[in-house]
Every structure is written in C-alpha cells, then in structure tokens.
C-alpha cells in the first residue's frame, strides 16, 4: 500500500524530499497501528488518532514535528479515500496547538554569511594600538591567531561546525586534493564528510603547508591549536562587531542549516548538519516553512 501511496504523491508532483518525508511519517503511524494491534485504517476513528498523538507527545516530540506527522497521515487518508478504502479522513482537521519554538530569531541570509567571512578575512588590526611599539613576537602571534580564526570562520559558515567539532579536527581530516573535510562524531553530532569551498582550500593550504599551524605549536595532529572553545567565544565577539545581528556561534550554525534547507532535501541536511535524529532537522524545516508562509501572506494577504 505504501508504494501506491508513493505513486499517489508523485502524481501530485510533490518534490522527492517531500514525498520521502510523507512516506516516513505515514510509516511511523502504520507501525504504531500494527504494534498496538489496532484496526485497519478504514475503521480508524478520531480518538484513535488522538491516542497516536498522545504516544508521540510521551516520546517528547515537539508540537511542530507532531503536526508534520499529522499532515502526512492526513494525506495518507486522502489517498485511501481515492482508493475507495475509506469514506472520510479523520485527520483532516486535527492539529495540535502549542507554542512552536523557533530554532533561531533573525537568521542570517546567505549573502550575509559570505560577507561575514570576507569582512573578517580583510579586517585590519585596531588602529588605536601602536603596533610598532609591540614586540615582534606579539605581533606575529596576533597575525597567526587571525589566520587561524579565518579557518574557523570558514568552517562555521560553509560546514556549520560547532566548537565541539572544531576541537576534534586533525590535519589528516583535511583532504586538499579532493577538496573535502571529514568531521568526527561528538556526543552531539554524527560524523560526516563535506565539501570545502574554493576559498577554504586556498586558506587551508597556506595554513597547513605554509607553516602557520606549526608556529601556533599544535599538540600532535590537532588542526586548531589552543583552547578552541575560547577561540570561538572571542572570535564571535569580533564577528559581532562586523554584524551586530549575531547573537552567538549557534546563531551562525542555525543560519547555515536553514540555508541548506533551501537547497537540499531534509535527509541531506540531516547528514550535512550531523544531526543524530531527523526531528532535529525537522525543527529547522518547520521554521523555514513558517517563514515562507509569512512572506507569502505579506505579498498575498487574501490568498
């Protein structure tokens, strides 16, 4: 029956990623029906659906994710109606009320993220400081730290890395020939391999092979010597000076994930972001859908 449901969705010209989401959500529901020994869908009542919702709530799924699943279930019942299996859709008017928490307020746009990188890369040292009076060692350390921070900003903006992932990076995780980076797993995220941007490849080549990293006195094979959490904190404070909208490092990461959702399907974004659970990605997806709906309502208030 699921294969026929897939054909039904394809005939309605849904995107492949959307179809996969509906199939997955309908699958969750049907497994629950089977596990609980419930009646066939044609005999399902509204109260049965409420029991399913309660089950998902007990699993601590948020309101937005549950409503996404209800939407898929509703489409499944519309498919069954067309097949003549059911005469009504008990999920058609079912929606769970509750406050949907946005992942992030005022996310940065793609061009703002790129501008942030380019602006930081070109930033001049504070002109209020008389750099000529500082020792050569201090000036060199400052310049080296700036080069290291350019690498960090790039990894935050193009790969959406958080400090825990940055801390675990080693030189052998960078493949300059393939233009890729391997990101090890952490307690918060899965491992993955992502592409590097052209700008990153050039900077990483200089950083790794040009002696910059070695001068920062790394321990063993670590890519970013020193206390990475401190680096990210103070770097973020500098980035706020370039773009006051920035709240913290997670603000940047969330903006990147939302941008990915405009370009890739949900499963791809889950992999790229290292999310352990698809529900983490769905939280971003719901915010993006709500943003688009709000924009459409502004342009077409009576639509």
Regions found by a protein language model. Give the residues of each.
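Conserved catalytic core of the tyrosine transesterase superfamily
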Residues: 1-303
